[in-house]
Amino acid sequence: MLRLPAVLRQMRPVSRALALHLTRAYAKDVKFGADARALMLQGVDLLADAVAVTMGPKGRTVIIEQSWGSPRVTKDGVTVAKSIDLKDKYKNIGAKLVQDVANNTNEEAGDGTTTATVLARSIAKEGFEKISKGANPVEIRRGVMLAVDAVIVELKKQSKPVTTPEEIAQVATISANGDKEIGNIISDAMKKVGRKGVITVKDGKTLNDELEIIEGMKFDRGYISPYFINTSKGQKCEFQDAYVLLSEKKISSVQSIVPALEIANAHRKPLVIIAEDVDGEALSTLVLNRLKVGLQVVAVKAPGFGDNRKNQLKDMAIATGGAVFGEEGLNLNLEDVQPHDLGKVGEVIVTKDDAMLLKGKGDKAQIEKRIQEIIEQLDITTSEYEKEKLNERLAKLSDGVAVLKVGGTSDVEVNEKKDRVTDALNATRAAVEEGIVLGGDCALLRCIPALESITPANEDQKTGIEIIKKTLKIPAMTIAKNAGVEGSLIVEKIMQSSSEVGYDAMLGDFVNMVEKGIIDPTKVVRTALLDAAGVASLLTTAEVVVTEIPKEEKDPGMGGMGGMGGGMGGGMF
């Protein structure tokens, strides 16, 4: 008989040795003060220099090597920032912090990443310089944030709402690097699906850009399991002419889904299951049949929570001509499903993050009735959150989905153009949301006088305000520099001109920016400055930087091979 305590005693030394091995981390390298800041600043400079060349209408492209496929050619600031990974760990920390600025700006505003990057570099550089001369970094940061708050108030005063399709086209054109075709196509898309409608960007199959309006619904829930993927072109599941099973309840048992699968199989149609959740035996069976016999099925979690989920499922049922199982007041069981209970759609696209139901076969009169119900709810609700959700539902039911198909002669060209189209689309949405200000980063220059009215508590806070005053000139100077002219002279001339005059870098002339349609979304400018100041001023307060020292791998040597070679040599001769 095996005695457990004796076995455990024998294993104890092994366990201790193993635990030590598992918990041991890399050794750390620690740098203090000026040494650490100098290295971080080098990383900030490297990243900012790479991103800054893309700025403005005459900015250059950046070619990025990829681990697979062709190199990527882009003018998109956040794409360039994300691609940079430095060997030196201290430099890399500086670069990664500014990378975060670009990412945050991109996520919140969808554009303005290059502006955010050059602003962050300027604040960090000026801050480090002042700290090296004995200034207090915490007070400098307070001064910086005081100045940023004043600039944001001034930007809101300058901001004008976007009202006409022409203004929408102008914003999109500027963000697309002056491409009027992209500007017009985005303006058309917004006109057709509404300002809050769903607009997606895809690869086209022709040389020209195309706009397609598809009647359908998109929601932010992807496939439950990646085993449902049925195409090699991207991680997604695509079906044509499919049935849709909708359930308010969780589906766990196989018996619940077999009748619907049999109906879909009998009619030779794929089946899309949208439920609160699909798990247990039901999910295992679906995945197994998908892999073994190629069953055309995909399971997706229903979007939203509580009443919002119920409403969205009901919208889907009306749009597709189906029924919602588990709905209160309806005595429908999944086991008793009939063909008329299943919704019908012309096309389904499901990725890991979202799903699109396109060309629904629902009754037009029922859809119109549902739209009117939502409009009535909009009129009586006072909650901003409720209004937002109702508008989303309204857009999905009434306007459909606009698909921008980007054309080109090669994958490299299409990908570069897609970056610009996505930027332009995001900028346009931001402009519709918060309005527009002067473009070419002239709006930041016009905010400089507002800093004079701030009363700092001490000299170091005053230094922080001066840093922002100097920093606000940097984006306009960078645009001018990329156009081949002296940035400081251009900025000086803009400051001496009337409030609506700025520099048109494409034409190399001073013009009325509003009349020329050179405008920026207020949200983009505001977010770029706020994110840059927050991270860069925090960077200047760093006194110690800790990094890991990678463990050196021992060279196993080639002794065995050498011996083998010798033996083979002897044999051959």
From Swiss-Prot:
ATP binds at K75, D111, G112, T113, T114, T115, G440, D520. There is a cross-link at K551 (Glycyl lysine isopeptide (Lys-Gly) (interchain with G-Cter in SUMO2)). Gene3D superfamilies: GroEL, GroEL-like equatorial domain, TCP-1-like chaperonin intermediate domain. One of its GO terms (cellular component) is cytoplasm. Its main location: mitochondrion. The modification N6-succinyllysine is found at K31, K82, K125, K133, K191, K202, K205, K218, K236, K250, K301, K352, K396, K481. It comes from the Eukaryota. Residues 1-26 form a transit peptide. The modification N6-malonyllysine is found at K133. It catalyses: ATP + H2O + a folded polypeptide = ADP + phosphate + an unfolded polypeptide. Its EC number is 5.6.1.7. GO terms for biological process: apoptotic mitochondrial changes; mitochondrial unfolded protein response; positive regulation of interferon-alpha production; positive regulation of interleukin-6 production; positive regulation of T cell activation; positive regulation of type II interferon production; protein folding; protein import into mitochondrial intermembrane space. Keywords: Acetylation, ATP-binding, Chaperone, Isomerase, Isopeptide bond, Mitochondrion, Nucleotide-binding, Phosphoprotein, Transit peptide, Ubl conjugation. The modification Phosphotyrosine is found at Y90. It is found in: Mitochondrion matrix. Belongs to the chaperonin (HSP60) family. Homoheptamer arranged in a ring structure. The functional units of these chaperonins consist of heptameric rings of the large subunit Hsp60, which function as a back-to-back double ring. Interacts with 2 heptameric Hsp10 rings to form the symmetrical football complex. Interacts with HRAS. Interacts with ATAD3A. Interacts with ETFBKMT and EEF1AKMT3. Interacts with MFHAS1. Chaperonin implicated in mitochondrial protein import and macromolecular assembly. Together with Hsp10, facilitates the correct folding of imported proteins. May also prevent misfolding and promote the refolding and proper assembly of unfolded polypeptides generated under stress conditions in the mitochondrial matrix. The functional units of these chaperonins consist of heptameric rings of the large subunit Hsp60, which function as a back-to-back double ring. This is 60 kDa heat shock protein, mitochondrial. It comes from Bos taurus. The lineage of its organism: Eukaryota, Metazoa, Chordata, Craniata, Vertebrata. The gene is HSPD1.
